[in-house]
């Protein structure tokens, strides 16, 4: 496609695109107007140089314009990771989302099937009995009646089909791996976002600020997890009231024991679903600890708790009272109605 060639030529020199140029270039990519050779060369040029903030904002804008949107209550948040940490861990953000919803904060969770693990959010939720691929009206009902919905990425970003073959052929991370967490179909203004590389934390936080987010914690565990980990400290880049600050979370400071990486390693969706149900039924496991830690952080991001310790305590209470188990039961029932 001739109109795409100027953008390809510019990135080939190592120069960065402006926000507007990136938006237009990704409009072409997502419209299916670009050959596989052009798309692959373009994406790899960005990858090798490193994507600039304005390029990520422009790309996200192009994808957001095309996504199927969902109406969510005010104050809804997302708990999501970029994936790609190759940890094979349990479905931490999924369980944390259930706990957060049980504490009264609506969670519009956006996710997909496994990319680098054996069980992604979609995989474990399906194993738990949640129906995937609901239309926007069905998702809105889930939010209203269960306080939680799962927006299956492939049902909301049909334009991604144009670049799917290229991504498979490249077989490596590209900018598209980052766009999912930046393009929540419910337009949430608050996020707990995990990243597979610490170097991404501040740039993606600034991108979300540019895209209109109001409160964000972007986290990267010292063990490489795209979650707040319990094996050691976690670095946090927080967007709060228009300002960005950096701090570290140590699970021991909120009364949680350190875990080993093996403690957090999951398996297939059925195994992870059974482990999740066990936590909701009261099992005190390392999976429980990391889930209440992440849910506690989400409650702070949502403004429902003043501090992490309070958030962790509320998340734990949601398990003990059965409120979290009830959220999952309602989500299964409403999604299958």
From Swiss-Prot:
The record lists the organism as Methylobacterium sp. (strain 4-46)
What's this protein's family per the entry?
Belongs to the anthranilate phosphoribosyltransferase family.
Q: Where does anthranilate 1 bind?
A: 81, 112
**Keywords of this entry:** Amino-acid biosynthesis, Aromatic amino acid biosynthesis, Glycosyltransferase, Magnesium, Metal-binding, Transferase, Tryptophan biosynthesis
Q: Does the keyword RNA-binding apply?
A: no
Enzyme Commission number: 2.4.2.18
The record, for InterPro entries, names: Anthranilate_Pribosyl_Tfrase, Glycosyl_Trfase_fam3, Glycosyl_Trfase_fam3_N_dom, Glycosyl_Trfase_fam3_N_dom_sf, Nuc_phospho_transferase
* Name of this chain's protein: Anthranilate phosphoribosyltransferase
Write out the pathway annotation from the protein's UniProt entry.
Amino-acid biosynthesis; L-tryptophan biosynthesis; L-tryptophan from chorismate: step 2/5
Give binding positions for 5-phospho-alpha-D-ribose 1-diphosphate. 81, 84-85, 89, 91-94, 109-117, 121
The cofactors named for this UniProt entry are: Mg(2+)
Where is it found, in Gene Ontology cellular component terms?
A: cytosol
The protein's matches in HAMAP family, at most eight in alphabetical order, are given as: TrpD
Q: Which reaction does it catalyse?
A: N-(5-phospho-beta-D-ribosyl)anthranilate + diphosphate = 5-phospho-alpha-D-ribose 1-diphosphate + anthranilate
Instruction: Identify the enzyme class.
Output: transferase
Record carries keyword Repeat = no
